[in-house]
Amino acid sequence: MTPKTTDERVRFGVIGLNHEHIYGMVRMLQTAGAELVSFYAPEPELAAPFAERFPAARQTTTQAEILEDPTIHLITSAAIPDERAALGIAALQHDKDFLSDKPGFTTLDQLAEARRVQADTGKFYAVFYSERFENAATVRAGELVKAGAIGRPLQTIGLGPHRLRPTTRSNWFFDAPRFGGIINDIAAHQMDQFLFFTGSQHAEIVAAQVGNLAHPQWPGFEDFGDVLLRGDGGTGYLRVDWFTPDGLGSWGDTRLTVIGTEGYIEVRKNIDIAGRPGANHLFLVDGHETRVIDSAQIELPFGRLFLADIVARTETAMTQAHSFLASELALRAQATAQRIGSEWS
């Protein structure tokens, strides 16, 4: 269902609370003006804190109640990753747009079916690449690159280290088929940023590798992955891992470097180690100087643009092709990755 006029408020439901990203997604949609109507989660321990945080939302006893509600325009989800595609496809088939936490898929077959249904229905299947959409320094970096601040972009380097915190994780977290592997799970962010900053419309995986280098107690887990890729707008390298030490004052020292013909930009998203306090650190080096750029007042426009797209059926927040391609690259890199580490034990 699509809002009938631009004045009609976008109404959305939530199905699946298995990752805490859902709280940020809901907050983003509400801040942009959408109304949370209802939610469903089969796990009482997940439903209770969500209901307390969003008391105006009605808790349903089945997900079908949300899918079949004709007043709901959008469904958003942070379900277990291998369950997201089936839910998203069902949402589209019920005439609703869908916003998924990343990863939006765990297999290439799921992606192919989602593409088919999306083409048939014309509804949005969007993946929420929060490292770009919800990070002010990265948004500002995009504005600078678009304005030509570093010339023509040549390469992105994306680093996505994370802290493991194993006692806070559910069993599915350590089972690669359930989350699609480390490249598919985490590096979907870096694939999105590679496409966005280089302007690539097509890309290929040059090399990829994954491994469980230090956690033999979870044989189905992967704690390291990296990828080299090439697009029609530039090249990219990315590394993701679960080795952030407890001594760091953040869950991960995630970084983005964009190299251009006339300079480069580095974004230290969460922390500037032993440097400036806080997050959202943006550095620009060009032919004249080195600058630290303040991004504190930068608007995060994704929510506003996405809701406008739902109403107008435009693609200003992110194109459908981009959403799918970033996921496809992560899936293809995961599927073709060489497994490493056993020779080091």
Residues of each region from the PLM?
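C-terminal glycine/acidic-rich active-site capping loop/insertion
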Residues: 13, 247-248, 253-321, 342-345
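A contiguous active-site-proximal alpha/beta segment in oxidoreductase catalytic domains
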Residues: 82, 105-167
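Beta-loop-alpha module in the N-terminal Rossmann-like domain of NAD(P)-dependent dehydrogenases
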Residues: 43, 54-117
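Oxidoreductase and adenylate-handling cofactor-binding alpha/beta cores
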Residues: 134-157, 184-213, 226-235, 336
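Mid-domain beta-loop-alpha active-site segment that forms a flexible
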Residues: 128-136, 167-203, 220-223, 322-323
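C-terminal helix-rich "cap/oligomerization" subdomain common to oxidoreductases
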Residues: 1-9, 14, 74-76, 305-345
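N-terminal Rossmann-like dinucleotide-binding module
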Residues: 1-54
